[in-house]
Amino acid sequence: MNREAIFHNPVSNYAFPISYEKFKVRLRARKGDLDRVTLVIGNKYLWHTRKEVPMEVEGSDELFDYYSYVYPVDDPRVAYYFLLEKGDEQWLYGDSGFAKPELVNIDEDESSAFVNFHFPFINRIAVSYTHLRAHETD
């Protein structure tokens, strides 16, 4: 797994609300490098209710695959991390970088704060008119 090519920024076009009820998350990886990408996402204050969802390749260019998932938001306080798999190799990728999943107890408050990317609150002002208009055809 080429970890150097993996990229996500929670305050960018890699994580943003596309409507008042939908939050889009993207991950970049080396083209053809990963077998599976799972997004683990949920309410940061009700972390035990998190969901594990497979991400699909949204697009590719010469160097990278871009994975994405649109999360239906029921609470605007979102936290998430990625589980990356290639063959028998697994890595958890979060705000503090990479970790082996078996070494992290994600259910401990300290661990989830260390691991998770955070989008603190989906404010109605953060949902741009352009995003609303662009996704009316969905």
Where are these regions (language model features)?
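Glycan-association/targeting regions that enable binding to alpha-glucans and other polysaccharides
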Residues: M1-Y129
